């Protein structure tokens, strides 16, 4: 440790290694400090004992000030409202519990279909429809939350291997709280639909909840069987969502249900797309599925084969969309539909190539699956303008 004393009333301590003046031919005073002798320059003198004490007092006073200030900062950090902190953590856990990427798909899909129905019937648009549309979106989010939530409750062991970041698997949300949330989502969704959309749409909504239940809950737990699992996901996310939202929107406009070519296209397109999502969603989970003896196409056929199968089915979708634009120019805007789907198909081919070059690592598989969801969002964003 070095003690430097100068003419100014400042005292400087350093924890660096001693850097003292080398011994010279001239005699210099020294000060004994903690068993060590520190050489001092010749012109430095302690004029009186009081000066030394004043300097010691200065150092001690400043040390106490710094110490008090540091302690007060620590105390302030520790005195943050624990209730607000718990609320923030619970909100974060609930948001992760809802699986945000599925919420985005549900919200975009319903918004796109409502927008398309309104574009086809602009003369029937009125402000009272906004509240009805928002209530429908709320019901869909509740249904989505119920389905993904109950799946997490029955997949805790698997998620600790495959998805340890999910709130129940991570210990951020208790099973009891999760049950309360899924029960709330189911009841709230059914009430909103029942009061706003009539018995037929309520029946479709109930069917979606039922399919989501048997997908995850024993003894049926249909997710154990690949074909049944794919059909359930494709039915709920593909057909029921698109048909139900479009039917409800036309009913709110006072119109009978009638298929239009664009709506038939998006329903078919998204149903096949949902099938691809159902196939590829197990790609990042192969390790946990094998450990818990869950039979999926990925565990049976291998990650590479399923990735190529998923990409191939999506390419069929894109080729069909481009063909429709050529075949029905009076229905679809070919100037948008053709180049947009060429770009999306090219992106899919490139992402599949990236996955192949990465040798199907877990990170590359996760990136590929996220890209598929981005393609899903992109189709709904395009749909109102096709």
Curated annotation (Swiss-Prot):
One GO location term (cellular component): chloroplast membrane
Membrane topology: Multi-pass membrane protein
Annotated EC: 2.5.1.117
Reactions listed under catalytic activity: all-trans-nonaprenyl diphosphate + homogentisate + H(+) = 2-methyl-6-(all-trans-nonaprenyl)benzene-1,4-diol + CO2 + diphosphate
Chloroplast listed as a keyword: yes
InterPro entries, A to Z: AtHST-like, UbiA_prenyltransferase, UbiA_sf
Entry's transmembrane regions: 130-150, 181-201, 204-220, 225-245, 259-279, 306-326, 335-355, 365-385
Location of the protein in the cell: Plastid, Chloroplast membrane
Transit peptide: 1-69
GO molecular function term, any single one: homogentisate solanesyltransferase activity
Activity modulation notes: Inhibited by haloxydine (3,5-dichloro-2,6-difluoro-4-haloxypyridine).
Recorded superkingdom: Eukaryota
Keywords: Chloroplast, Membrane, Plastid, Transferase, Transit peptide, Transmembrane, Transmembrane helix
Disulfide bonding pattern of the chain: none
Main localization, broad class: plastid
Pfam families from the UniProt entry: UbiA (PF01040)
Note: Seeds overexpressing HST accumulate increased levels of tocopherol.
Record-linked PANTHER family: HOMOGENTISATE SOLANESYLTRANSFERASE, CHLOROPLASTIC
Sequence similarity: Belongs to the UbiA prenyltransferase family.
Functional summary from the UniProt entry: Involved in the synthesis of plastoquinone-9. Can use both homogentisic acid and 2,5-dihydroxyphenylacetic acid gamma-lactone as prenyl acceptors, and solanesyl diphosphate > farnesyl diphosphate > geranylgeranyl diphosphate >> phytyl diphosphate as prenyl donors. Do not catalyze the decardoxylation of homogentisate uncoupled from prenylation.
Protein name: Homogentisate solanesyltransferase, chloroplastic
Organism, as annotated: Arabidopsis thaliana (Mouse-ear cress)
Lineage: Eukaryota, Viridiplantae, Streptophyta, Embryophyta, Tracheophyta
Gene for this chain: HST
């Amino acid at each position: 440790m070095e003690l430097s004393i100068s003419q100014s009333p400042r005292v400087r301590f350093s924890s660096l290694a001693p850097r003292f003046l080398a011994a010279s031919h001239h005699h210099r005073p020294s000060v004994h400090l903690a068993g060590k002798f520190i050489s001092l320059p010749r012109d430095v003198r302690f004029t009186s004992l009081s000066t030394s004490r004043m300097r010691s007092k200065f150092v001690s006073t400043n040390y106490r000030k710094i110490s008090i200030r540091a302690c007060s900062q620590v105390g302030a950090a520790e005195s943050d409202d624990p209730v607000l902190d718990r609320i923030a953590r619970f909100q974060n856990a609930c948001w992760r519990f809802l699986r945000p990427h599925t919420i985005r798909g549900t919200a975009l899909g319903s918004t796109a279909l409502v927008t398309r129905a309104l574009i086809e019937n602009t003369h029937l648009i009125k402000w009272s429809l906004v509240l009805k549309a928002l209530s429908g979106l709320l019901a869909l989010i509740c249904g989505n939350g119920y389905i993904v939530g109950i799946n997490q409750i029955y997949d805790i062991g698997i998620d600790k291997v495959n998805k340890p970041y999910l709130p129940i698997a991570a210990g951020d949300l208790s099973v009891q709280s999760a049950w309360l949330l899924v029960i709330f989502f189911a009841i709230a969704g059914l009430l909103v639909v029942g009061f706003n959309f009539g018995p037929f749409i309520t029946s479709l909504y109930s069917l979606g909840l039922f399919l989501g239940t048997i997908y995850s809950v024993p003894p049926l737990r249909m997710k154990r069987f690949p074909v049944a699992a794919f059909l359930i996901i494709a039915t709920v996310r593909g057909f029921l969502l698109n048909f139900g939202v479009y039917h409800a929107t036309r009913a709110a406009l006072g119109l009978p249900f009638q298929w239009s070519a664009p709506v038939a296209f998006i329903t078919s397109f998204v149903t096949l797309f949902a099938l691809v999502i159902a196939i590829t969603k197990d790609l990042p989970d192969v390790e946990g599925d094998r450990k818990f003896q869950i039979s999926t196409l990925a565990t049976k056929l291998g990650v590479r084969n399923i990735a190529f199968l998923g990409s191939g089915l999506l390419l069929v979708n894109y080729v069909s969309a481009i063909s429709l634009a050529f075949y029905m120019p009076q229905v679809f805007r070919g100037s948008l539909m053709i180049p947009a789907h060429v770009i999306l198909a090219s992106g899919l081919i490139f992402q599949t190539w990236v996955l192949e070059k990465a040798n199907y690592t877990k990170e590359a598989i996760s990136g590929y699956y996220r890209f598929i969801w981005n393609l899903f969002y992109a189709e709904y964003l395009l749909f109102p303008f096709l």
